[in-house]
């Protein structure tokens, strides 16, 4: 017997039973309604909407695969906001159509491309105005594991003053050059934070306390493009936030699978190099304070 047939049979016998028990008619009606609703409605309709924690998905020309990402995220959390960062493909129309039939999804549009950090700042500023306090950032390309969203959010709710970081676990689909290359950047980031415990500075699947992140971003002109994730992690650690690492599997998609990458090895590695030069200068200037802060954290 199929699941649908099983549910139909249960509802039939429940209804027959209530004919001899009039007081249970209302209960029976709700039971049948729940059977039908659970069978045909997406899980996202059963989610409780958070008043404090929101998911932000910045995207730039992500292709049609962004809908798969958004739907996977919506199954795990509400609300979800997508920030379109000057996209020129047809994904914006697809996202707006999706949001029109999903009250838990909102699409914000920046007409000019400003970079991932710029998109996150735009969405975060609006979210703060609406009373949200924390944001989990998810890449639009589907590499981040949506089923782990409740885990990261729960940890953030338990430790609201911490920076909750996804720590990537790579499989065979991950390009070796990128996996090995990030070790260099992570080494510098850990030095710049006196090895406070950054599991991975480049992985963008993380929960930010938004007020602290907004303050950091408004106090400098950088962190707007590919340098956003690592510089945000370092500067928030400088601000005293404790990093908490949670293992998260990463999946890379080929072009044939709809994967889209805007990473440019030359341009973005130069950007990261310049970022670490700036951060090392800041690290040296702040070293006495950072040492005191680290000692206090170790004693806590």
Predicted features along the sequence, with ranges:
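A conserved acidic beta->alpha catalytic loop
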Residues: 84-93, 142
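Short, well-formed alpha-helical segments that are part of the catalytic scaffolds
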Residues: 61-75
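Acidic helix N-cap motif at the loop->helix transition within catalytic regions
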Residues: 64-68, 89-98
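Acceptor/aglycone-binding surface of glycosyltransferases and processive sugar-polymer synthases
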Residues: 111-112, 117-129, 146-226, 253-263, ...
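Short beta-strand-to-loop acidic/aromatic patch adjacent to the donor-nucleotide binding site
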Residues: 132-141
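Hydrophobic helical membrane-anchoring modules
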Residues: 38-50, 219-300
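Short beta-strand/loop segment that forms part of the nucleotide-sugar
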Residues: 78-87, 108-110
């Amino acid at each position: 017997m199929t699941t649908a047939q099983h549910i139909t049979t249960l509802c039939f016998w429940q209804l027959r039973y209530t004919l001899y028990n009039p007081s249970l008619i209302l209960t029976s009606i709700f039971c049948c309604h729940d059977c039908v609703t659970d069978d045909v409605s997406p899980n996202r309709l059963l989610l409780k909407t958070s008043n404090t924690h929101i998911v932000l998905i910045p995207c730039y020309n992500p292709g049609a695969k962004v809908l798969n990402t958004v739907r996977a995220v919506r199954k795990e959390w509400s609300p979800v906001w997508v920030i379109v960062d000057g996209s020129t493909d047809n994904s914006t129309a697809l996202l707006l159509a999706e949001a029109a039939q999903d009250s838990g999804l909102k699409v914000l549009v920046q007409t000019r491309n400003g970079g991932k950090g710029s998109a996150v700042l735009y969405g975060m500023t609006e979210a703060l105005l609406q009373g949200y306090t924390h944001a989990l950032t998810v890449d639009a390309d589907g590499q981040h594991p949506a089923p782990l969203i409740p885990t990261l959010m729960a940890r953030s709710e338990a430790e609201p003053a911490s920076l909750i970081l996804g720590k990537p676990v790579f499989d065979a689909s991950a390009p070796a050059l990128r996996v090995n290359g990030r070790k260099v950047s992570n080494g510098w980031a850990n030095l710049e934070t006196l090895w406070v415990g950054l599991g991975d500075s480049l992985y963008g699947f993380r929960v930010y306390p938004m007020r602290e992140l907004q303050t950091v971003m408004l106090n400098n002109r950088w962190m707007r493009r590919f340098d956003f994730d690592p510089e945000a992690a370092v500067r928030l650690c400088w601000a005293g936030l404790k990093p908490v690492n949670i293992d998260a599997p990463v999946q890379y998609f080929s072009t044939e699978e709809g994967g889209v990458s805007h990473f440019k090895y030359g341009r973005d590695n130069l950007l990261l190099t310049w970022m670490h030069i700036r951060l090392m200068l800041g690290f040296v200037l702040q070293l006495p304070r950072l040492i005191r802060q680290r000692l206090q954290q170790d004693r806590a």
